[in-house]
């Protein structure tokens, strides 16, 4: 495997689900902030920025977890923990990607740039929260959802209350899907003394996931309704609700394969909401 392929794996470009889980909330925000008519330049900036920052986050995560990943079945072959990439290289990759991302938003307003600094700090510190915070997935939800206030700031030069409520919804969504993800690694994480929501929720993990989905979908529906979205948005939300119910059938047995499949399927939940938002603005 050549160096380029190793870097490709380091930043998880071979696993785009993480990019999509960041991108959908950002797109919801851009469409709502612009009344369904987003600027194509802004769309390009935020889409590329999402890819770059998620990639930087993966590099930082592998650096921070290099002494733990070797003991987890799913992560044992990651480039840093396996010694194929040096920790210093991972840090340099993360720094380069973060700088590129910041360069992208340099032409935007001051508020957006200020929020981007907060986003970088949150993304960079997330891996360490897993060591002492009982539900680190909540912090992940802030990191994965910071494109929401940034999107509103870029379009409106302000961040309305609705944007913060969407961010709260994204926190609950992240707790839901990343708990499914954590259920895959629960036994390994227990041995390592790591803290995850799957461990914290214990035997109530499935109920907690479904509760988080309910809060997520409820908050998003309320925000969309306040923005005048109706029929097609409601249809998208109905499909998203169906996705959440389907996830219950996948995780209720707590089997690794089912939990991982549920995690990956969240792409379609986010896409359904986005599709409903776009169609509602188009068909009026």
Curated annotation (Swiss-Prot):
Cite the GO molecular-function annotations of the record: 4-hydroxybenzoate polyprenyltransferase activity
Q: In what way does this protein cross or attach to the membrane? A: Multi-pass membrane protein
Per the UniProt entry, the Enzyme Commission number(s) are: 2.5.1.39
| Cofactor(s), by name | Mg(2+)
In terms of PROSITE patterns, this protein maps to: UBIA
Keyword list (alphabetical) reads: Cell inner membrane, Cell membrane, Magnesium, Membrane, Transferase, Transmembrane, Transmembrane helix, Ubiquinone biosynthesis
Major place of residence: membrane
Q: Which NCBIfam families match?
A: ubiA_proteo
Concerning HAMAP family, the annotation shows: UbiA
Q: What is this protein called?
A: 4-hydroxybenzoate octaprenyltransferase
Q: Which organism is it from?
A: Herminiimonas arsenicoxydans
